[in-house]
Swiss-Prot record:
Pfam families: C4bp_oligo (PF18453), Sushi (PF00084). It comes from Bos taurus. One of its GO terms (biological process) is negative regulation of complement activation, classical pathway. Glycans are attached at residues 66, 221, 525, 602. Disulfide-linked complex of alpha and beta chains. Residues 49-109, 110-171, 172-236, 237-296, 297-364, 365-427, 428-485, 486-543 form the Sushi domain. The keyword Glycoprotein applies. SUPFAM superfamilies: Complement control module/SCR domain. This is C4b-binding protein alpha chain.
Length: 610
């Protein structure tokens, strides 16, 4: 196929005409469309074609389309559909040769006018006021809508208008409130009541109101005024006061109750409430919820403890009729002449199984039978009672005689012991033993049983053993004590003791150890002896001269153990100098003493009688 030559075209910016070089017969009213058409025509000779153009919601072709294929560059002019207006001069579609029609939206929806404000209501705009849009109308609380609840922007002639006019919102109205039997309301004789109005009902005497006393005019479904809630009714309601065993009323005292009156119950001490404590009188003359019950929640009465009595609690005496809470503790004590059988608290506790805990029994107090050992006899026995299995019980009194010359009395106490002591006759004892470095004192001049001797030691001695001895059937008891010597702590220069104490007791032994460089002169072990001295005598700690050291002795000892001869020489010179100083000081003291004696010789005593 032979391609045609494309002629040159010149467009005038200010004119509406375009000329071909070989003809002046072409006249173009729309230069832009002409230019686009020309370019599309030129492209069509090179590229492909397009199918039927797409359907547009906002526009349709000006000319009827009879073809199904269009060459590249074909331009189709469109016009806006009803409800739309043109927004661009490029109201056409162009075939781009790739089977696509290219265009930019050139029509927009027309807009309806602002519907205005709705008195006592609201205009709800879903999107905007454009063609096809919807608006809704609603009224404020207490108002009803008269008219359409919505409106649409629709076509009319060549323009767009709202389908429905602006409605009205008028205040809701209710019919007069209903009348009720055996009651009335406080409203007037008005033909109607506006939204928010209320009336209050009251019942005739002896009638109870079932329901709410006041009702109000409300709006139902946003369309009609109704009374809410429903009017009450008046009915004779009588509830009889229920009896709750082991319970009591704390609020709402009757005995006759009407509708919705209430009672509050509580249980007596030791009982547990089962059910609701608050009940109401209902319209059917019954109580709702049902009256509660009081269940036992403690220990009823007191346990029987023989030979015991209960102690007072909160200044009150316990009784068999009382109920005691779980965990409640009661104390008891045994009768006179009785005591707890075992050690432990004399209490009982109310347990969770509503039973009392086990208790310690009270056992009769018995005193032991006197053992006079054939040295005496009981002369009198006075007892408070004979109903006992004991020979001697609490309160018994006896008199007994020992050695046919000593008389004693004894009382059986509540603790099962004799007072002042257990009756006993023992043989007489000889004089208490004599001990070295000590002496004894006796309580009585007769050394009879139970008499005592008290020992004490001389100064510088300490008692070892029992201080007091008693006269028993086997003699003086316990063993005779001893008086042991006390030795003072030895003072040893440069030494230390194995046991450091202020005083040491005969025959205590200590060991002496000397400090480093010193050795023990004497016995290392010394013993505290009976004469309060150390035996052997206390040792000394003396200096031990190391091997290879120089020694100088002149009235005292000086030892220098030095490594170099120069140091040894210096030490000896220092020692020599110290000796010279000591000699000078001694001579000075001697001279001063001589002068003092000379002055004393020259002192005379002058006597002047005047």
């Amino acid at each position: 196929m032979k391609h045609q030559r494309v002629p040159v075209m010149i467009l005038h910016s200010k004119g509406t005409m375009a000329s071909w070089p070989f003809s002046r017969l072409w006249s173009i009213s729309d230069p832009i469309l002409f230019q686009v058409t020309l370019v599309a025509t030129l492209l069509a000779t090179v590229l492909g074609s397009c199918g039927i153009p797409p359907y547009l919601d906002f526009a349709f072709p000006i000319n009827e389309l009879n073809e199904t294929r269009f060459e590249t560059g074909t331009t189709l002019r469109y016009t806006c559909r009803p409800g739309y207006r043109i927004s661009s001069r490029k109201n056409f579609l162009i075939c781009d040769g790739t089977d696509n029609w290219k265009y930019k939206e050139f029509c927009v929806k027309k807009r309806c006018e602002n519907p205005g404000e709705l008195l006592n209501g609201q205009v709800i705009v879903k999107t905007d006021y454009s063609f096809g849009s919807e608006i809704e109308f609603s009224c404020s609380e207490g108002y009803v809508l008269i008219g359409s609840a919505n409106s649409y922007c629709q076509l009319q002639d060549k323009g767009v208008v709202w389908s429905d006019p602006l409605p009205q919102c008028i205040i809701a109205k209710c019919e007069p409130p209903p009348t009720i039997s055996n009651g009335r309301h406080n409203g007037g004789d008005e033909d109607f009541y506006t939204y928010g109005s209320s009336v209050t009902y009251s019942c005739d005497r002896d009638f109870s109101m079932l329901g709410k006393a006041s009702i109000s005019c409300r709006v139902e479904n946003k369309t009609i005024g109704v009374w809410s809630p429903s009017p009450p009714s008046c009915k004779k309601v009588i509830c009889v006061q229920p009896v709750v065993k082991d319970g009591k009323i704390t609020s709402g005292f009757g005995p006759i109750y009407t509708y919705q009156q209430s009672i509050v119950y509580a249980c007596n001490k030791g009982f547990r409430l089962e059910g609701d404590s608050l009940i109401h009188c209902e319209a059917d003359n019954s109580w709702n919820p049902p009256p509660p019950t009081c269940e036992l929640n403690g220990c009823l009465g007191l346990p029987h403890i023989p030979h015991a009595l209960w102690e007072r609690y909160d200044h009150q005496t316990q009784t068999e009729q009382q109920v005691y809470d779980i965990g409640f503790v009661l104390s008891y004590k045994c009768h006179f002449g009785y005591k707890p059988e075992t050690d432990g608290p004399t209490t009982v506790t109310c347990q969770s199984n509503l039973e009392w805990s086990p208790y310690i029994e009270c056992k009769e107090v018995c005193c032991p039978e006197p053992n006079l050992n054939n040295y005496g006899s009981i002369t009198l026995h006075r007892r408070p009672s004979t109903s006992t299995h004991c020979t001697y019980i609490s309160g018994d009194k006896i008199s007994y005689e020992c050695h046919s010359k000593y008389m004693f009395d004894a009382l059986c106490t509540k603790h099962g012991t004799w007072s002042p002591r257990t009756p006993e006759c023992r043989p007489d004892c000889k004089s208490p033993p004599v001990i070295a470095h000590g002496q004894h004192k006796v309580v009585s001049k007769f050394f009879t049983f139970d008499h005592q001797a008290v020992y004490e030691c001389d100064k510088g001695y300490i008692l070892v053993g029992a201080k007091e001895l008693s006269c028993t059937s086997s003699g003086w008891s316990p063993a005779v004590p001893q008086c042991k010597a006390l030795c003072l702590k030895p003072e040893i220069e440069y030494g230390r003791l194995s046991v450091e104490k202020v005083r040491y007791v005969e025959p205590e032994i200590i060991t002496i150890q000397c400090e480093s460089g010193y050795s023990v002169v004497g016995s290392e072990n010394i013993t505290c002896s009976e004469d309060r001295t150390w035996y052997p005598e206390v040792p000394k700690c003396e200096w031990e001269y190391p091997e290879g050291c120089e020694q100088v002795v002149t009235g005292r000892k000086l030892l220098q153990c030095l490594s170099r001869p120069e140091e040894v020489k210096l030490a000896l010179e220092v020692y020599k100098l110290s000796l010279e100083i000591e000699i000078l000081q001694t001579n000075k003291l001697k001279k001063e003493a001589f002068l003092l004696r000379e002055r004393e010789k020259n002192v005379t005593c002058d006597f002047n009688p005047e």
